[in-house]
């Protein structure tokens, strides 16, 4: 969808650039409520994920990441906004009467037909195993574990590429630049996730950020020493260290956070950029 620029009637909308409005009329049997009470805290009430809290109430849409409706074609009926992700979703009416939500593939329009299975065309929105796809295919919603459902390349504009197949494994280049092995029997959806311009949006004001459940971000250098290692000093003082750190004293700006000796290290051929 296109990026919409506001008319500069107020200072808050002068710098705003948001996506054009997509209506949301979810089906009652495909939604359920969520109770957001954590606000970035753990069970002891300590902040473990900063800058979270508040936000508008949301209803969770049940998304079909498994795409296990085999050899039954479905038709795209609506393209809707989902408050729980930056990608749009599609309501699919299948031939047997069932209705499901899927991620909106880029370029898909209302009335298009999709299908899942092993011997289906290599066309946008169709889901099939990696072993049945030709090399160079652009894919998204990729399974890591067979039958568990898609877990990779699900954000707006995300796309991965099938670059090799050898033995029981397929080699993929993920959106992060990581190159890794995945079982050829795992399924994926052909095409790119829609709403490619999601990263070009500018909310323009703090209130819009608040509606998304994101709290203000404060620099550590303006805090007190009890709150951050960078804090304290008289007036505008430097951080007082050779290198910046996190609020808990660990090195910041580039420290690797991935667990050492993780079981999946043997499947990663090249680390992400």
Curated annotation (Swiss-Prot):
Residues 262-273 have a biased composition (Basic and acidic residues). GO terms for biological process: mitochondrial translation. The keyword Transferase does not apply. Residues 1-23, 224-273 are annotated as: Disordered. Keywords: Chloroplast, Plastid, Ribonucleoprotein, Ribosomal protein. Part of the 50S ribosomal subunit. This is Large ribosomal subunit protein uL2cz/uL2cy.
């Amino acid at each position: 969808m296109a990026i919409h620029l506001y008319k500069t009637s107020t200072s808050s909308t002068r710098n705003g650039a948001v996506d054009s409005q997509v209506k949301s009329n979810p089906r009652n049997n495909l939604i359920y409520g969520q109770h957001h009470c954590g606000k970035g805290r753990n069970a002891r009430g300590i902040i473990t994920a900063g800058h979270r809290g508040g936000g508008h109430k949301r209803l969770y849409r049940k998304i079909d990441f498994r795409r296990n409706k085999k050899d039954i074609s479905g038709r795209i009926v609506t393209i809707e906004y989902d408050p729980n992700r930056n990608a749009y979703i599609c309501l699919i009416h299948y031939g047997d009467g069932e209705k499901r939500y899927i991620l909106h593939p880029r370029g898909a329009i209302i009335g298009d037909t999709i299908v899942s299975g092993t011997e289906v065309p290599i066309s946008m929105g169709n889901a099939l195993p990696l072993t049945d796809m030709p090399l160079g295919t652009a894919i998204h919603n990729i399974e890591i574990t067979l039958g568990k459902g898609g877990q990779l390349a699900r954000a707006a504009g995300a796309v991965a590429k099938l670059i090799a197949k050898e033995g029981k494994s397929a080699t993929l280049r993920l959106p992060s630049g990581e190159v890794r092995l995945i079982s050829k029997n795992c399924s994926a959806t052909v095409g790119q996730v829609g709403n490619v311009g999601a990263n070009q949006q500018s909310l323009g004001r703090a209130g819009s950020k608040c509606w998304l459940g994101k709290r203000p971000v404060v620099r550590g250098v303006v805090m007190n020493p009890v709150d951050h290692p960078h804090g304290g000093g008289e007036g505008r003082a430097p951080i007082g260290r050779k290198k910046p750190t996190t609020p808990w004293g660990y090195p910041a700006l580039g420290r690797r956070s991935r667990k050492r000796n993780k079981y999946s290290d043997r499947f990663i051929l090249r680390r992400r950029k």
